[in-house]
Amino acid sequence: IVQGRLTQSPPGCLQWFPQDDWQNEFSIASEIGIDYIELIAEVQHNTNNPIWTDEGISQIKELVEKNNLNLHALCNDYIIKNSLLDESVAQQNISLIKQASKLGVEKFIMPFFESSELSQKNMQNFLQPLKKVAKEAYVHNINVCLETILTGHELIKLLDLVDLPNVKVVYDTGNRVAFGHDLAGDIRLLDGNIEHVHIKDKNQNNENVLLGTGLVN
């Protein structure tokens, strides 16, 4: 489960870091049978997020071991409000990958939305910074997983252009159905390029709903 989803979030806020209660989520996850938490770095840089300090990383490791959890993914929401086309943002990703490697993280999730929205028209612009980030991740044995609004065919084109073995795809069931994509067709097309899955459901108004009550089949 994604970090922050086991704590009551502020009104209207779905993706957030539970600043005052982040440690408790690890024990809650263990108690309800969840075996791992996907860590997040926020849309605005937060120096108090434990991912940014060695002391914080030690705390995370201790909590994971104490609660018998796994730890293999980190999502960098920072690029949602800060364009990856900016050199400083690319460097933020590289710094975060180095921190993630200290935790043994295997997957680095990059959500290409809003300020970093990646489309068929602009994908050439993103190749250089994306390759730069992915090459750093490769050094640390980390796969970079791209979450985008692209269709399956457009994603295949992007992966061919990037042409790096550690660049893969995030398949988010809710987002895919919200954009009218062919879920089954895309899954068959992307096949082994799907490295990470976010399972959620959405209704016709693009609202998150309980699994099984929306448009995802």
Where are the regions a protein language model picked out?
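Charged helix-capping and loop-helix junction motifs
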Residues: 20, 52-58, 86-94, 122-131, ...
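Glycine/Thr-rich phosphate-binding loops of Rossmann-like dinucleotide-binding domains
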Residues: 47, 118, 207
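Active-site acidic/histidine proton-transfer and metal-coordination neighborhood
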Residues: 24, 63-67, 81-169
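Hydrophobic faces of well-ordered beta-strands that scaffold small-molecule active sites
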Residues: 1-4, 10-11, 37-39, 71-76, ...
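N-terminal pre-domain/capping segments
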Residues: 1-101
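Acidic/histidine-rich catalytic cores of soluble enzymes
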Residues: 74, 128-215
